[in-house]
């Protein structure tokens, strides 16, 4: 009986090892260009660009530059940098909610 149990356990072990759930493959880190990694939204400019505040290491949200006489483009920086251009439109959009 012991030989039968050992055969069953050996069979179960080999079956489990060969047909076990495969671990999820780790995502390969793809180096993104600086322009895409530091951008704050689609088509809203990038941190550090002219008219935007902050840098790639600073969470920020950039808005399109208006045609009015504004030195900034309506950008809000969080953490590390000073919060700038906190106007009503920026606050209403929820951009500065985490500041």
Curated annotation (Swiss-Prot):
Coiled-coil ranges per UniProt: none
Residue segments, region Disordered: 1-42, 65-99
InterPro entries associated with the record: NICE-1
Record protein name field: Cysteine-rich C-terminal protein 1
Highest taxon of the lineage: Eukaryota
Composition skew (Low complexity), residue ranges: 83-99
Compositionally biased residues, Pro residues: 22-32
Pfam families on file: NICE-1
